[in-house]
A protein has these predicted regions:
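Pre-Walker A-like glycine/lysine-rich segment at the N-terminus of P-loop NTPase domains
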Residues: 2-78
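C-terminal lobe/lid and adjacent interdomain/linker elements of RecA-like ASCE P-loop ATPase modules
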Residues: 2-16, 292-380
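Phosphate-coordinating catalytic segments in nucleotide- and nucleic-acid-processing enzymes
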Residues: 2-31, 81-271, 356-367, 376-380
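Conserved glycine(s) of the Walker
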Residues: 69, 254, 285
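Walker B motif beta-strand of ABC-family P-loop ATPases
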Residues: 275-277
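Walker B catalytic acidic pair
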Residues: 279-281
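ABC ATPase nucleotide-binding domain "signature" loop
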Residues: 283-285, 316
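Conserved D-loop-proximal element of ABC-family nucleotide-binding domains
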Residues: 286-287, 291
Length: 380
């Protein structure tokens, strides 16, 4: 059992996200509120601290067939956070799928104070000259009172005037600082630098890596080198420095992923990031271990924190967590456009006895891939 870390955590909750002409998302919306209190839930405190009626989904398992946008959604969020922190418009323009059309992102989130923030960034075409376009920022906010619901706060949102000169250094003067950690392949700066006690991270690293590869029991802090650890297997030494493996070719794919998993779990235990996104990091790891480590993550999630966890593992459908914790992405081609949509298990399965696994197996959530093209490979 990991020792409890006594530390006041950071608030970071996403309530709503809208994307239009962003990567493969057109007119897309995903919402993280839920209407009804769940009795005896295994995920406690799914509401804003001291605001019991302001409910949010604290842990979300995001599923769907290949190429439905699970990883891309994480990339979009990472770049949106980049916009908030730096004001750099390139984070926005790099996401636009078709630059000849308008594009838009809109995110609602809570961080720090009990204030609902809404940031909208859009690419708008000049009405007199379609070749000209401009990026428009809009920021709205509203205070959250102890008796407020999410829906009630939406009615109070007010536009705040933005100083264009300040936009060049980011929107945090308006929104406050944001806190997050991503485990996302092929992305730089997934894990923000955080101050987790090296002894805590070492303990988590030993537990995770030692479970994935029992031959890796000798793990220690590398003396004299900041933020560095050495993993030993006999005469071999694998160095982990600044969250990156120097010679990862000596480890299995699952063990390499385990380092990112350990970083994420340590961050959650220390309550230092607030928002966490774990994207398909258990593809090379046994299903029972995925379930166990996900359980550890939600066990240590504190009030006003949030985890989005993407996976293809259908065994995750058997977890004893609320139905509203499951969301399914699907993607269809409508004319010349790719349409990505989300379906929440709780919107379809209303009875306590309804099985999410059975519903998924019967493609209720449109999450089963179309295998018809493979039929030609089986023809005589």
């Amino acid at each position: 059992m990991i020792d409890e870390v006594i530390k006041e955590g950071y608030t970071m909750i996403i309530m709503n996200l809208e994307l239009d002409n962003i990567y493969g998302f057109n007119d897309f919306r995903i919402n993280f509120s839920y209407p009804k209190k769940i009795v005896n839930s295994n995920i406690p405190n799914e509401h804003l601290k001291d605001c019991p009626k302001f409910r949010y989904k604290k842990a979300v398992i995001l599923m769907g067939a290949n190429a439905t946008g699970k990883t891309t959604l994480g990339r979009a969020l990472l770049r949106i956070f980049g916009i908030i922190e730096t004001g750099n418009p390139n984070y926005f323009t790099q996401m636009i799928r078709d630059k000849n059309k308008t594009a838009r992102i809109c995110i609602e989130f809570i961080n720090g104070e009990k204030i609902l923030n809404r940031l909208t960034v859009s690419l708008e075409k000049d009405k007199s000259n379609s070749l000209l376009a401009s990026i428009v920022y809009k920021y709205e906010s509203a205070p959250i009172r102890p008796t407020d619901t999410y829906e009630k706060v939406l009615l109070k949102m007010k536009t705040q005037k933005l100083d264009e000169k300040m936009l060049s250094v980011g929107l945090t003067p308006y929104t406050g600082q944001i806190f997050y950690s991503f485990a996302l392949d092929n992305e730089e700066n997934n894990h923000q630098t955080y101050s987790t006690d090296p002894k805590l991270f070492l303990k988590v690293l030993k537990a995770v890596i030692g479970t994935l590869d029992p031959s890796l029991k000798d793990i220690s802090i590398l003396d004299g080198v900041e933020n560095s650890y050495v993993i030993r297997r006999g005469s071999q030494e694998i160095i982990l420095q600044n969250n990156k493996l120097v010679n990862q070719n000596l480890l299995s794919s699952g063990t390499v992923r385990g380092v990112d998993i350990a970083l994420l779990i340590a961050s959650i235990i220390a309550n230092e990031r607030g928002f966490y996104y774990c994207d398909e990091h258990f593809s090379y790891i046994q299903t029972d271990l995925e379930k166990r480590m996900f359980g550890i993550m939600i066990e240590h999630l504190q009030e006003d924190e949030q985890l989005i966890f993407t996976t293809h593992n259908t065994d995750m459908l058997d977890l004893n967590i609320p139905k509203h914790s499951y969301a399914f992405l699907s993607r269809n081609i409508e004319g010349d456009e790719i349409k990505t949509s989300v379906m929440y298990a709780s919107d379809v399965l209303k009875r306590n006895t309804d099985s999410i696994r059975c519903a998924a197996a019967n493609d209720v959530f449109s999450s089963i891939p179309d295998e018809s093209l493979l039929d030609s490979l089986s023809e005589d």
